[in-house]
């Protein structure tokens, strides 16, 4: 897989924008060819019954927590994200999602283990790019991401959302980190013993997730058995909906 190095001037520009605005866009974080490879893999995984969890919260989406390929990207792209943000990071978890026609992502903030989040486009079948929107610098901004392009943002601080999807499918992976010298270091590996595929029935976390989705959250209310909108792959009642 081709992961291009970021030269010093570009890295400095990205880090400055990230410091100032809370987000930056990294074109071709992986090559378009590598993105297409993973998109094909993700689509083929639909043939494995139970591999993805339906996500009614997004109207038309399926997702997988800690998919092995996504976890690989989480590790392999850590240094790239560190250069682009100017921060030393710890990996938390990844999430692979396939959106279908009519899918929508309500405006929301993420939980602490998504302190430094990335959204990486892998592939799609649609008439046009489907922007990921953020509120930064006092304005709403639509960020188009082609295959291989990555948005890096402060997930718990930068509101983000997507308008209804009009294409057939859109494959996206999300890579989440925390600052190595920050206040959320306990969220390393998202409470797991290691990075890699996670079976919630046989494996345990060393903490229980917080019940808040973030400050000023505007995410619509979800039912207790619906997938948690944070992208964990767990039911809402077992994740952000857990009673304190």
Give residue ranges: language-model regions.
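Conserved double-stranded beta-helix
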Residues: 57-58, 63, 73-132
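Non-heme Fe(II)/2-oxoglutarate
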Residues: 2-85
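Acidic/negatively charged segments and metal-coordination signatures
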Residues: 203-244
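A structural connector/turn signal
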Residues: 13, 138-140, 217, 225
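Short, cationic low-complexity segments
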Residues: 139-142, 193-214
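Catalytic core of non-heme Fe(II) oxygenases with the double-stranded beta-helix
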Residues: 101-157, 169-172, 178-194
């Amino acid at each position: 897989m081709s992961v291009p190095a970021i030269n010093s001037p570009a890295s400095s520009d990205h880090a400055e924008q990230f410091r100032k605005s809370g987000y930056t866009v990294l074109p071709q974080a992986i090559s378009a060819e590598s993105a297409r490879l993973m998109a094909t893999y993700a689509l083929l995984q639909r043939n494995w019954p139970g591999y993805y969890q339906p996500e009614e919260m997004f109207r038309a989406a399926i997702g997988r927590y800690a998919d092995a390929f996504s976890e690989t990207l989480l590790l392999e792209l850590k240094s790239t994200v560190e250069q682009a943000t100017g921060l030393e990071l710890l990996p938390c978890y990844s999430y692979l999602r396939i959106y279908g026609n009519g899918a929508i992502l309500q405006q929301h903030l993420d939980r602490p283990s998504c302190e430094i989040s990335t959204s990486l486009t892998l592939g799609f079948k649609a008439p046009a790019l489907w922007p990921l929107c953020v509120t930064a610098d006092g304005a709403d901004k639509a960020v188009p991401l082609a295959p291989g392009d990555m948005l890096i943002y402060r997930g718990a601080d930068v509101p983000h959302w997507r308008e209804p999807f009009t294409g057939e499918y859109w494959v996206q992976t999300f890579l989440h980190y925390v600052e190595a010298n920050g206040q959320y270091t306990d969220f390393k590996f998202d409470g797991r013993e290691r990075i890699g595929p996670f079976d919630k029935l046989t494996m345990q976390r060393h903490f229980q997730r917080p019940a808040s989705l973030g400050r000023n959250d505007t995410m619509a209310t979800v039912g207790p058995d619906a997938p948690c909108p944070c992208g964990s792959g767990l039911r809402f009642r077992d994740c952000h909906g857990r009673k304190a």
